C-alpha cells in the first residue's frame, strides 16, 4: 500500500494514500457475478442475466459501495501502519487521480505519564432511608392534590389566582388591562418580593408592591428598575392531599394496592436515581481532577470547535423544547462554549488513553445490567431491551457510556480518595 504521512500542525496530520485498483476491480467483478446469479429480471431466466445488463443496472452502485468500503479499509490500515491515534473524524478529499486520496485529521496529544495515583478524589456515598421513601410518598400526594377555595388570607402552600399590572416610571405593563396567572406560594415560581407580598391577601383584596428587579431580569422593561406592581387576589385555595389508600397506590401501577409493595417499588426507583446521581458526582469529581492535572496539554483545535458547536446546538434545542424562540443564532455563538468544550475534550481523550494504556475492556455484564436498569423505567421493559439490541446506534451509545463509567471507577479506586457521606437529598442535588 502506498501511503505517506506529514505533520501540518502540532496535532494535525495529512495522510496521502492510494487505493489498490486491482482489489477494487476484483471486488466489483465478484459482486456483479453474484448479482447475476441471484437477481431476477423480467425477460431473463434466473441466473442467466447477461453481465452487461447487470453492469448497466447495478454497476454504478456496486462500484460506489466497493470504493467506500475499500477507502475505509485502506485508511484504517494506513493509520495502524503509522501507529496513529485519531482525535475525531478525518476529512478525506480526492487526490490527483480517482484512486488517490488525502486525509486530514487530528491526533491524540501526548499526555506523558498518566499517574492517577496522584489524583485526590472525593467519593460521595449515600443510601435510601425510610424517611426518603416517606418524603417521596408525600411528593406523590402533592402531585395529586386538589384545591379548595378559602376565605382566609393566603399562606405558604396555597394557590393564588391573581391579576397584575406594573408601573415602571412612565411605562405601564401591560399598556392596557391586566395580566392573569396563578402561583403556589413558596414554590419559587414568582419573583421572591412579589410572592412574599401575596401572603395574607384574601379573595378580592388588592395591594401595591414596591419591587426591585435585578439587572438581568428576563423582562427588559423591568430589568434593573424599582417598579410598582399592583396585584389582586382573584381566588385563594388551599391544597387537599389524597389519602394513601389502595386506590391511590393502584394509580401508580401497583395492581395489588399493597402499601409494602408500593414502598418497595419506591425504594427501587430511588436507589436507581441515587446510583445515577453518585456516578454523575464521581464523573464530575474525576473530570475536575484530570482537568487540573493536565490543563497544560494542548487539545486538538478542530475537535474542540466541533464539541463547542455541538454544545451550542444542544442549548438551542433545549430552548426550543421549552417553547421559547432562540432567535437568530450568530455564526460565532459557539465561541462562548470553547473553554467548556476544551475541558470536555480533554477529559474524554484522557479517559480513552487510560482505557487503552491499561487494556481496560468493556464488561458485557455491566452493559446488560445498565440496559436492564434503563428498561426498568418503562412500562414494557422487554420491548426497550429489544429496541436497544436491534439499534446499533443506541447500543453503541450505551456501550460508550458504560465504558466511560468503568474507567471513572478504575481511576477513582486508584486515586487518593476520601469518602463523603451524604443524605439522599444532598446526593441527588445537582
UniProtKB/Swiss-Prot annotation:
Which EC numbers does the record give?
5.2.1.8
Q: Which GO terms describe its biological process?
A: 'de novo' cotranslational protein folding; cell division; chaperone-mediated protein folding; protein transport; protein unfolding
Q: Check the record and name the InterPro entries matching this protein.
A: PPIase_dom_sf, Trig_fac, Trigger_fac_C, Trigger_fac_C_sf, Trigger_fac_ribosome-bd_bac, Trigger_fac_ribosome-bd_sf, Trigger_fact/SurA_dom_sf
Looking up Gene3D superfamilies in the UniProt record yields: 3.10.50.40, Trigger factor ribosome-binding domain (3.30.70.1050), Trigger factor, C-terminal domain (1.10.3120.10)
Give the UniProt keywords, A-Z.
Answer: Cell cycle, Cell division, Chaperone, Cytoplasm, Isomerase, Rotamase
Domain (PPIase FKBP-type): residue spans on this chain: 157-242
Q: Which GO terms describe its molecular function?
A: peptidyl-prolyl cis-trans isomerase activity; protein folding chaperone; ribosome binding
Reaction(s) catalysed by this chain's protein: [protein]-peptidylproline (omega=180) = [protein]-peptidylproline (omega=0)
Comment field on protein domains? Consists of 3 domains; the N-terminus binds the ribosome, the middle domain has PPIase activity, while the C-terminus has intrinsic chaperone activity on its own.
Q: Give a short account of what the protein does.
A: Involved in protein export. Acts as a chaperone by maintaining the newly synthesized protein in an open conformation. Functions as a peptidyl-prolyl cis-trans isomerase.
The entry's protein name is: Trigger factor
> What organism, scientifically named, is this protein from?
Xanthomonas axonopodis pv. citri (strain 306)
